[in-house]
Amino acid sequence: MINRMYVITLLSVLPFTACGSAQGGEKAEAPEVYFIREITPQNMVRIYEALERPATGKVAVKLSTGEPGGHNFLKPELIKDIVTKVGGTIVECNTAYGGGRARTQDHLKAAADHGFTAIAPVDIMDADGEVSLPVKGGKHLKENFVGSHYPRYDFTVVLSHFKGHAMGGFGGAVKNISIGIASSAGKA
């Protein structure tokens, strides 16, 4: 099961440690937000280190590998240092809307074409199906269907880029983790 989840966006790092207490009806604490002036591989590592919460166990690095032929993804040369530092495996689930990442073999090709397989292993977590995770205290959801490989990871680092998304409004860290680890049934 996942111990802790951290979201690292281009301009800030936002610990999601308050989520558990918020689900339980307790008042959540305001998160700390870290800013950097220049987005570099070194500053990505610096902002991660500022959390003082090292990734432990088997580490998933959730990001978007981008659509085939597209350019809307974090460049591997920007994130390589942080992925290497945490010893991470890049993880995603197949898309539910068709396109070049709807089938595992095509998804892996897109990841390779965009340079991600050159910096770390890539795991398409729903390649072997899905699992149901309980949602504690959920108002609208009692369970969430995610890729069957997700429970293999002990720690998740989420690297996100903010964007306008034709199908779902704005996309960023919350969309990256919610839709990005969901199986096709979990996206429905």
Residue spans for each PLM region:
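N-terminal secretory signal peptides that target proteins for export/translocation
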Residues: 1-2
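Hydrophobic h-region of N-terminal signal peptides that target proteins for export
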Residues: 12-18
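N-terminal and secondary-structure boundary signal
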Residues: 6-8, 19-188
